[in-house]
Amino acid sequence: MSTWTSKIAIVALLSGCATSIPAPDRADLRIEGQVVSIVAPAGFCVDPQSVDVTKAGGFVLFSDCALTGAAGGTVSTAVISASVAPTGLNGTLVELQKFLTTEPGKITLGRSGDMQAITVVESRVVDDVLLIKVDDRGAQPIRGVSPEIWRGFFVAGGRAVTATVSGAAEGGTSDIHARRYLGQLAASTRAANKT
């Protein structure tokens, strides 16, 4: 095997070790040498094509298990994404909440990038999870998605995790369900990362 093909094989092998999906509802992401397990709420499964790890952190997308080909679950139009930072949270959840509800902070919560179109509808810390409901009436980068989303911020395995629940523009996801999904994801993820 030539030197350049050996290097390609090594890179492919190493990149393959960055993620694994040990169960339909779980993705293990190796970030900066540490594995962080992200566990979906009941009825949601990993979209295997979505799992990604870079120097900036990790990402995974969960949707209804019936849509990903796995058995079980009730039909839901919600999609849940989770991003894991390579570091922990700088400061407290209350400090993060204060920043994200300011004009400059709002821009990071929406999708449109239009600060004037983004409104923080609700914000609270429950069970060590910062929950924020966002209404973004700007141009959406993804067609067919509701302008209302819920974001959850928490720490698991020493890493900052940001989770988002999005629903379809028609029908959407109720606030109760969105908060429940974020709470379940945070609790399951924390439990999976206890050392």
Can you say where each PLM-predicted feature lies in the sequence?
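Bacterial N-terminal signal peptides that target proteins for export
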Residues: 1-9
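C-terminal motif of bacterial Sec signal peptides marking the signal peptidase cleavage site
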Residues: 13-16
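Post-signal-peptide N-terminal segment of Sec-exported extracytoplasmic proteins
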Residues: 34-65
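A mature extracytoplasmic/lumenal domain signature
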Residues: 40-42, 50-52, 86-88, 134-138, ...
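Bacterial signal peptide processing site
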Residues: 18-21
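Conserved polar/disulfide-associated segments of primarily extracytoplasmic proteins
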Residues: 58-144
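Surface-exposed amphipathic alpha-helical segments
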Residues: 160-195
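Short, surface-exposed beta-strand/loop micro-motifs that present aromatic residues
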Residues: 147-155
